[in-house]
Amino acid sequence: MARARPIPISFLPAMLLGVLLCTSATATEPPWLELHSTHFTVITDAGEKKGREVALRFEQMRAVFASLLAKDRLRLPVPLTILALKNDKPFYQMAPLRQGQPISVPGFFVPGDDQNFIVLNLFEEESWRAVAHDFAHMLLNYNYPPAQGWFDEGLAEYFRSIRVDNKQVAIGSDPELGASFSDDLLQNQRELRTSKSLTEFLGGQVWLSMADLFTMRHDTSTYQEGTHHTLFYAQSWMVMHYLLNQKKLPETGTYFDLVQNQHVPVEEAISKAYGMSSAQFEQAVKDYFHSLRALFTALDASKQPGVAASAAQVYQFPVPLGPDDMVISSKPLPDADARALAAEIKVRIPERREVGLKELQALAAAGPESHAAPKRSAEENASESNSAIATATGNELAHRVLAWDHIQHGEFDEAAEELGNAAALNQHDVWIRYYLSLLKYRIAQSKHLEIQGLANMMQDLRAVLDWYPEFADADDLLGVARTEGGSPVAAMQAERAAIQLSPRNEQYVLHLAEIYLTGKNWEAAKALLERLKASGNTQIAATAREKLGQIGNEQKYGMSSATGTAAGNLTTQKSPFDALVQDAAERAAAQTKSEAGPDKRPSQYLKGNLVAVDCSQSPAATLTIASGARTVKLRTGDFKSLLLIGADQFSCEWRDRSVSVNYKAAGRGAGDLVSLEIR
């Protein structure tokens, strides 16, 4: 028997060093990274390569979805952050619970009015596919007018089947099909799938009539869905399969116009839109379904013991963009910020909220000792600020998220204190300006008061929109502020921008109706309120019915729905956030004089030729307009806030243009611009 030889003493230091190095490498977690692609932010601890792959896959899925809707551009009015975790332990510690257990899928979506989040478990392959259904709903909500449940769910299920790599997109398979059997640890076969796939539902003899399918109510606004293993989901999926691949989306738009705007009965609308009866339409979809042999081949394979479910797709085509088409930036993210982000996501999941709050409070209290920001009331914090920014301790993101949570629960004093602490730690965080504006609005709502610090609120919201131009909620809040400030035309411009960015948001539509009421445009307000009174949101429906009842009194007695706006609301006050966007502060100061009280001068209309534009005192501008033998000079305090029609943005280079203007006279041959139309 061979004897083990002793290790020479001279080798021990080298071996010990190697062990220490290995231990150190194992113990050190990969750094957190923050990656930015064209449309998404990815936060990951899985390394830059994985982070780039996640960003690429979501950009690819976004591009494929745009092609399905035949759109050149998709809007994203709520910022989306993707948290991609390398291990399943932290993933399951924050995942939503179902019957007391974390969900089994490797990805989930957390929606919000201010931010959306996606969380992925990168320990699983292609984890992004787990959120494809919700991702489709999100993009659909922002980029397609209100539709019916079969359309939304059918398109989301179709998109859920997507597979994408660096070269090819594959789509169209049964998204609910899985293997019927699996092997346990002892290689014994056990039954795995008990629910029917969509293909199996459609293979039966009974289908819903198209009229019944198209009239079934199904709320998709909350992202809260039950099982997808139903005939409704199966038939909706196949109808959209047919419409997309037979290029019938334009006819579908016609159908929705007939049903939702012209109130044509469903069967008649099907006939007019698709050129066939409801029965013929149903048969066309059935024939299309039976022609998709790949679905039946995959179903047969899934029923065979020892054979994995087939991933064969119905359609394949080249990727719309690949790794070489992407510009993705990357930078380290402090560990405390990453932990605060994870805690924020927990706070937004009801069953995880208490754990998330404890983590945020610990992060907010951590760090070197410092003087806390002075505690004041919510009204004091919302309407005025100290000339010097107070100091605070802890993590800025944690303070900001705690402020958001306090706002959601009506704890306004606490929210104001947390925002003050966050601003003391990082006055350049634009999110603070947004949440400060939201806080002012919520205080006014809850106490039935006017919004305090209105001029600063509008200044802050303009800074937010400069940072993220597609932020619909900032446009909406700006519309509300301008309405209260006595500028209904500018308010209408902001609210319409919000609705264009998020066409299914009924709260924005309600605010637009309120702007119409303020301007006594009764018919326009009635049209919107009549639509809203049938809303699935009971609070919005009740408000719409109440306002419809008020319109008669408004018309009869001439009562204004927005009277007595205090001039003091528009007095500019010093804010700790001025340093964020100095030019916005200057524009707000320039406007203060004109916005200091309700302008009772009558509006006048003029058509003529734009001779010259003087921007020497930017952002103010003076336009010289000739109309016949008359020449007038019309001024705007901020051309970036001027209501424009017929042009995307104001230009100081305009010359010799036909224009129409609304203005308020300010002396002989002079006035203040209200709106400008380029003809």
Regions found by a protein language model. Give the residues of each.
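Canonical positions in the second alpha-helix
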Residues: 363, 388, 421-422, 463-464, ...
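Post-HExxH zinc-binding segment in Zn-dependent metallohydrolases
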Residues: 89, 143-211, 280-285
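Beta/coil-rich, acidic/histidine-enriched accessory regions frequently appended to metallopeptidases
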Residues: 31-34, 227-230, 262-421, 428, ...
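Structural marker of alpha-solenoid helical repeat scaffolds
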Residues: 366, 391, 425, 467, ...
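Juxtacatalytic substrate-recognition/specificity segment
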Residues: 27-152, 159-169, 211-226, 262-276
